[in-house]
Regions:
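FAD-dinucleotide binding site
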Residues: 1-407
């Protein structure tokens, strides 16, 4: 089960809950805590990351990235014309937008969104003498990078890995900050009902679609334009996680710019030689130029009104590109009862619909804590989004009880 698949992307999350779990009559084991994400219900994301859907082309990423009258620029993982779905794609798009903006006569710059692409651009522009204001709808920076420590260790609710460390700009940044990185290996086991070990030859055919497509692209193979990925290339080398969470990397992007939190933008208008940005609090700000780093999912919702309206090629790109979904459920127990020395655990025989709680990441192997995390991606993740926390955790525990029978 090779974790470096063609479409491998980052992750993303909306925290749904953290509470001690209350056992019920059907629960054989009791976690001491949990973290659940629900990115499709996040009004500032509406999904995890982009993919090239059927009917879309790679050129749609270029169209999304193109500027409007050299005043409104676009950045984000979906606005990267050569690679998408990863944190380094977001970082590089922010650098690209900053370079484009530095080529014009714009002293004051507004940046919509304080995720990786927005802060990457802000750092570059402020370092070149521009007056930069970042407007962020959330009460925190980071966007789809979100590190949470309420279980004790740092766990990433959103993006988790540097995908390919060779020549990756994030490798250089993390080296400069002396951040501790942990390589994750490809060791795996497929556990069936009653804990039996299922050989590769006997694993169900649909399992690869779940682990290598739904959990990479955030979409099903039937939704993806696979031809668009044939000549896709990205950085090589191992994938690594951060011991203390991905959010540490933002220390490198500090700079002489202003960040306004809880500032939800709802309009962007070209007026004269400038750009007026309106917010839901009724305020408006004028800039010489702006960089829009809103996630593709938010652009699809039309939450921000553009005046004049976006050009047709850009609107079509927003419509045709797909917004994938990858959600996580972290479970913390008093002790490890699963395979302690294996990284990836597949659980296809859990009496749930295909794609639900079929893949797990064993954190105990890397941080010496009894924590295991489930992935749910693509259509199954959308199906699960409406469940309560209790229903979600019950399905997770049902799966673990079948794969590792108590007693």
């Amino acid at each position: 089960m090779n974790r470096r698949s063609l479409l491998r992307g980052g992750g993303a999350a909306l925290l749904a809950g953290f509470v001690p779990w209350q056992a019920n009559a059907k629960t054989a084991r009791t976690p001491v805590g949990y973290l659940r994400t629900n990115w499709s219900r996040d009004p500032y994301a509406f999904g995890s990351y982009s993919y090239i859907a059927k009917g879309a082309r790679k050129r749609d990423h270029r169209r999304l990235a193109s500027s409007i009258e050299d005043r409104i620029f676009f950045a984000g993982e979906a606005a990267n014309s050569t690679r998408n779905s990863t944190v380094h794609a977001a970082y590089e798009s922010g650098q690209r937008a900053a370079e484009e903006l530095l080529a014009i006569d714009a002293q004051t710059v507004g940046i919509i969104g304080a995720g990786m692409s927005g802060l990457s651009a802000a750092h570059a522009l402020a370092g070149n003498g521009r007056t930069v204001t970042v407007l962020e709808a959330r009460d925190r920076i980071g966007g789809r990078i979100w590190t949470d420590s309420r279980l004790g260790p740092a766990f990433d609710l959103g993006a988790s890995w540097i995908h390919g460390v060779i020549d990756n700009p994030l490798t250089d940044i993390s080296n400069a900050l002396d951040l501790v990185r942990i390589p994750t290996d490809d060791t795996y086991v497929v556990r069936g009902r009653d804990g039996r070990n299922i050989p590769d030859r006997d694993a169900p055919d649909w399992l690869d679609n779940v682990t290598e497509v739904q959990h990479s692209a955030g979409a099903d193979s039937s939704q993806i334009n696979t031809w668009a990925y044939w000549d896709y290339s990205d950085y090589g080398g191992v994938d690594v996680k951060f011991l203390n969470g991905y959010a540490e990397i933002f220390e490198a992007l500090n700079g002489a710019y202003e960040t306004l939190l809880n500032k939800s933008v709802n309009s962007i208008s070209l007026q004269g030689t400038g750009v007026v940005v309106g917010s839901t609090d009724g305020a408006s700000d004028m800039f010489d130029a702006v960089i829009v780093t809103l996630p593709l999912g938010v652009l699809k919702q039309g939450a921000v009104e553009f005046d004049p309206p976006l050009p047709n090629p850009k609107r079509r790109a927003i419509e045709q590109l797909g917004m994938g979904l990858l959600d996580k459920v972290y479970l913390q127990f008093d002790e490890v009862f699963w395979d302690p020395d294996i990284t990836w655990i597949a659980t296809p025989e859990n009496d749930l619909p295909q794609g639900q709680f079929n893949e797990w990441l064993n954190f105990a192997k890397y941080i010496d804590e009894p924590v295991i995390m489930a992935f749910n991606g693509g259509p199954p993740a959308f199906d699960l989004a409406g469940l309560t926390d209790e229903e979600m955790i019950s399905r997770a525990l049902q799966t673990l009880d079948l794969a590792y029978p108590p007693g």
